[in-house]
Amino acid sequence: MNDSFFQRDDVGSEPWWQAVACRGTPLIEPTTAGRYRLTFLWRDPAGASSGIQRVWLNITGVTDHHQPGLPQSLARVPGTDVWTWETELAGRWRGSYCLIPVGEPAPFEGEAKVDPQGIRLWWRSVFPLAQADRLNPRRSWQGGRGLAVSGVHLPDAPAQAAWTAFDEGLDGREAGASDLRQYRWDSARLGNSRPIWVLTTGNTTPEERPLAILLDGQFWAQAMPISGPLQRLTERGLLPEAIYLLIDNSDRALRGSELPCNPDFWLAVQEELLPQVRAWAPHALTAASTVVAGQSFGGLAALYAALHWPERFGCALSQSGSFWWPQRGTPGRLFEALEAGKGTGQPLRLFIEAGLREPAILEASRALVERLREQGHALDYREIDGGHDALWWRGGLLDGLVRLWQPLVAPDR
């Protein structure tokens, strides 16, 4: 290990671990210009000898199941309770990770040929053993697969100041938490029921407030509560007073059928849900101020809604959109819609992001953005050094809302 902590002669001692805890993990040190070495650590609770044989490191976009190579395990420093692994990344990287200690080697170790599908299945089998990094000073959270994960923000990563209170564990005292109300949507068209949340960030002119629909709303309401950051940006004048509708999509089977290019879902939203929401929380009906925002399948759904109902949804915020759907390696359904003329005649305001470490999504996003620009839409596109990861989505979601609603806050800017 190259980190200066491993040059000490008391590695693994209680004072050494106390020093590690004060600094926080992973240990981060600059190497060459714009790059940093990250050293991940895990302390074996059984001491220098135990039944733990591997501590797998699942870093989104670096060592996770989407990567072509073999999974990576920390290695024990001989004669100590210290397990460690290091890598080097560009300074703009941001990502989440978890540690998975297990009592046996993986079945694929020693095999000459790697079976990607077999490795994916193996990952799923060990996910229940995942744990967040107890030495990471920032608050952990439940990721999309229900895993406890921790986050890393390298020094040059885009700023996320609005999330500082969450990272420091202060979200329970954040402004805006009391303005989030939960309801239940019973859909006759879809034949199902789910929770939804409505957040209000101000009441000065209720009928003029814009509306934002956030897909995967249960994540933004509970796992990564967005109410405080939104309220904070509103109070700073960066966002207008608004209504936010957070729609639950946590059922994986329903999510896979409702979000990818499903007209019934969006007709149900327009015919059943939005009239109820307007009764609970009055807001403007103008398409130009209505945003649909989502990630992954939700990112696909957001752009699908805007292209097919531009008279209702004039803005789309799409992050890591699954534009390859329904089959990887072929032009997706949205490309077919654009070929058929969708998106022409009514310019949209679009904010699209993709991660540099999610190759299929990145390739499809670049191709789709080119087509959308040819149609003349007002479009902001960003590529982020990260994987398929809510840790950077949360910052881009706020940035996108600020950008899309900028005419409402500073019409002359």
Model-derived features with residue positions:
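Non-catalytic, glycine-rich low-complexity segments
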Residues: M1-L41, P155
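Short glycine-enriched nucleophile-adjacent loop
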Residues: G299-P310
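Alpha/beta-hydrolase fold nucleophile elbow
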Residues: H283-S296, A316
